[in-house]
A protein has these predicted regions:
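A short alpha/beta connector and helix-capping loop motif
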Residues: 61-79, 84-87
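Generic anion/oxyanion-binding catalytic loop in active/binding sites
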Residues: 5, 61, 115
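Acidic/histidine-rich helix-loop elements
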Residues: 18-26, 57-66
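C-terminal segment of classical bacterial N-terminal signal peptides
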Residues: 4-13
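Acidic/histidine-rich, surface-exposed loop or edge segments in extracytoplasmic proteins
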Residues: 48-59
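Active-site-adjacent betaalpha module
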Residues: 12-46, 81, 93-205
């Protein structure tokens, strides 16, 4: 059998051994997601007001969270007045409902989920509550964006709920996690088609 000669091999580039960490600074930000107006049916909508507590939502730790509180308060009060379901959560281990910011104090009878971690569906009756109340749409608001909003909002989408995320009602310790959360929820397979990004003043009932 005749020998086979491979030509041009020396001109092939050497295999790159860099990782995403090495190439981190080369990344370019994608275009920002589009924000869309939303009209909600209060009877089939639940607000998830996640982890707005004295431990997590302070001007020193998360100024964007602290700045969002007046707008979140106004929106929660409007939704409550229209009859929407309001569900709260606390995040820090051993935190209690009394740790929720006074501006966002739950009304009598409104559920407060205990510290459950990033995904509020895990080890809770949240999905059952939503189904029992006839909820089809959830509005995910909270801090941190990359934990409670990303994981609970994403999981709600995977469980078949429509998910509304007002980007001015989610926050983190710095900007990048907020950008990533918005990007992920608006692009991830099986999640993005259930998620709408918006602003609080673009939501009506």
């Amino acid at each position: 059998m005749a020998a086979v000669t491979v030509t041009g091999a020396a001109s092939l580039p050497a295999r790159a051994d860099s990782t995403i960490i090495d190439d981190w600074s080369k990344a370019k930000l994608p275009a920002p997601p589009q924000l869309k107006p939303v009209t909600l049916d209060a009877k089939t909508t639940a607000l998830l007001v996640m982890d707005f507590t004295v431990q997590t939502c302070t001007p020193a730790r998360r100024p964007r969270c602290a700045d969002s509180v007046p707008k979140v308060k106004k929106f929660v009060e409007e939704a409550r007045g229209k009859g929407a379901l309001i569900i709260y959560s606390v995040a820090v281990p051993k935190s209690v409902p009394g740790d929720i910011l006074k501006e966002l104090t739950p009304a009598p009878g409104e559920q407060v989920l205990p510290p459950l971690g990033p995904d509020k569906f895990i080890a809770s009756d949240l999905e059952k509550t939503l189904h029992d109340k006839g909820i089809a749409t959830v509005v995910a608001m909270g801090t941190q964006a990359q934990t409670s909003v990303l994981h609970t909002g994403g999981e709600a989408a995977l469980r078949g709920f429509k998910v509304i995320v007002p980007v001015d009602a989610m926050s983190a310790d710095d900007l990048f996690p907020e950008l990533y959360t918005a990007w992920h929820l608006s692009t991830a397979a099986r999640i993005s088609n259930q998620v709408t990004l918006t602003k609080l003043d673009m939501i009506g009932f």
